[in-house]
């Protein structure tokens, strides 16, 4: 029966997954191609105009003048977040309240199947789908880095006679040379950020399943999860507005989604990629947690929400179909 439930949830979600997979694979690739058409140092005057907004950025704005920094923004792009959240909210809220709303839950539970098996099979399909979507994002980044080159300004060299010193020639203008991106950026620097995106999706998915397990109407479950996310986003923005508002930062789970900061840390210190704690190198309270620490926080939130959902669904009395 477990295999039949797996097939049922695969059939229900395959079209949505394929549509999102198409976007999440090609968007990073196209974005990297677009970025690679420009020499980044030319954007320095533009970046200076946004210095007043630097407090809202997860890293110093100068980071966006580096190729690993500008590519890392992919994980904060609205398109990427919208696709991942669409999968998590749409599929998470469907498992209980969706079936009740459609009047199909009674028919499903009339079969020789435990309630926990319904949630477990749905979780397996949905979490696997989320993992594959995140892998496709990384695959798009990997191919974008390995199939594109970018113009880089390089000065001609001048060798001083007798001294055998080589210096930049001040009498000739800098020349533009196309350099493969894979010589400037290492794809493995984005592994932790990809895991952070997966953990964010898992946390939202857990919240969706938990809301669904308590409710009868899917539209209300969707509204609850979106409200929680928007409230967390507002608290996150508020916490960055002024130092006195920093007290709100621990109150939002979005504080644990830090892909740009992770990429910066890993680029400068590759050995810290798998750190749970970064306290010995921390310059602020945010840096006391390592990349895997942030991933673990979101994963624990998702597991806690799933645990509540399993408990509630196995204990509740199901309402009669409308």
Give each language-model segment a name.
Residues 71-98:
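Long, hydrophobic alpha-helical segments
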Residues 89-109, 123:
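Transmembrane helix boundary and interhelical loop/hinge segments in multi-pass membrane proteins
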Residues 68-80, 120-216, 290:
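Secretory targeting signals
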Residues 1-25:
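Aromatic- and glycine-rich beta-strand/loop motifs that create alpha-glucan
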Residues 88-92, 206-207, 253, 308-309:
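Hydrophobic/aromatic residues in alpha-helical transmembrane segments
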Residues 12-13, 30-71, 167-176, 221-227, ...:
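Terminal transmembrane helical anchor/hairpin motif
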